[in-house]
Every structure is written in structure tokens, then in C-alpha cells.
Design a protein with these regions (language model features):
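Anionic-ligand binding patches
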Residues: 45-180
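N-terminal polybasic phosphate/anion-binding patch
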Residues: 2-74
Length: 180
């Protein structure tokens, strides 16, 4: 059985598990070796625009690749960055995923979760979404669990499910390179 080696630009178990789940689903004939590393985003702790959120995901993935040695034989470098923005229909949270595979890259985005205006205002004041959600819902470290997504959807969707789907969609160019 061939091994697929993946580095995830985060130590957050939600992000590492999402990568493990998505890649195992996409490559069922491979043994998965997936490890997380601390990777700086180079953007604010709470990105407030789509542009900075995308940049954070790319920065993390690039950092992972830069830290890798050729003898490590890594197949993919994957990173997520969660952010918020004020869209035409109101504030929402979402995540970007950046994937590096050899000399190619793919960037994708998750679905957007509408946020209450009051939560967005707290974020605009400099707070992080996870902390705001913990305070409002009396949870602890929700960002390493179901996240705001889980709380606001009654766990019908979670950070893991949302990140898994975003990664699977962003993998399309690698699954069908002849089409891209």
C-alpha cells in the first residue's frame, strides 16, 4: 500500500482531522500520513476580509513547503485560514484552503455561514470569533471543536465537515490534472 505524506499548516485538531478525512476519502487505496505543524499566517489573528483570509491560507501552506526537506518526500502541503467579511447579504464567516502539490497550487473556499451583526461588531472591535462564541454560548475552546459553524447550525454542520468539503472541492485540479 502506497503512503501519502501530507503536512497541515496547523496544530488545530479540527484542521488536521479534516485533512485526514478528506484525503483518506479521495485516496482510499493509500495509507495516510498526515501531520500538523505550527505555521504562521502572516495576517491578523482574525482576518476581516476575503483577501486577507486567502492570503493567510497561502502563507501557511508556503511555510509548510519551505520547512520541508526533499528527503521528507511530502506529497501535499495544505493549510486553512478562517475569516469573516461583510458581504452584500451581511456578515459571514468562511475558510480558505490552500493546497501545494509539487509545483502546482489550488485554492478553494468553504461555504459562508451568516453571522449575527452583533458578533461581527465584536470581531470588528478586535476580538477573535472563537473567543466571542465561547463567551456567548458558554463553551470552552470551541474553535478546536465544532466552531461557530457547529454552534449556529446546532451541529448539523461543523468546522470539520465544512473544511473537509472545501478541501475535497479544491483537490479537483489534482484529481483531474488533464482537465486543468
Amino acid at each position: 500500500m502506497k503512503t501519502l505524506n501530507v503536512v497541515v499548516g496547523s496544530m488545530n485538531p479540527v484542521k488536521v482531522n479534516a485533512v485526514q478525512k478528506a484525503m483518506s476519502q479521495l485516496y482510499p487505496e493509500h495509507k495516510m500520513h498526515c501531520r500538523g505543524i505550527k505555521a504562521p499566517s502572516g495576517v491578523a489573528d482574525q482576518p476581516m476580509t476575503s483577501k486577507s483570509t486567502r492570503e493567510g491560507a497561502l502563507n501557511r501552506a508556503l511555510f509548510c513547503k519551505q520547512q520541508s526537506k526533499p528527503e521528507d518526500r511530502m506529497d501535499y502541503f495544505i493549510a486553512f485560514e478562517g475569516g469573516v467579511d461583510l458581504f452584500e447579504d451581511g456578515p459571514a464567516t468562511f475558510a480558505y484552503v490552500a493546497i501545494l502539490h509539487h509545483e502546482k497550487q489550488s485554492v478553494g473556499c468553504s461555504a459562508r455561514l451568516p453571522l449575527p451583526r452583533s458578533i461581527y461588531n465584536d470581531l470588528a472591535d478586535g476580538k477573535e470569533l472563537g473567543h466571542v462564541m465561547d463567551q456567548r454560548f458558554h463553551t470552552h475552546n470551541i474553535k478546536q471543536q465544532g466552531g461557530a459553524i457547529g454552534l449556529l447550525t446546532n451541529n448539523n454542520a461543523t468546522r470539520t465537515s465544512t473544511y473537509t468539503e472545501a478541501l475535497i472541492l479544491a483537490m479537483a485540479p489534482f484529481l483531474h490534472p488533464d482537465q486543468y
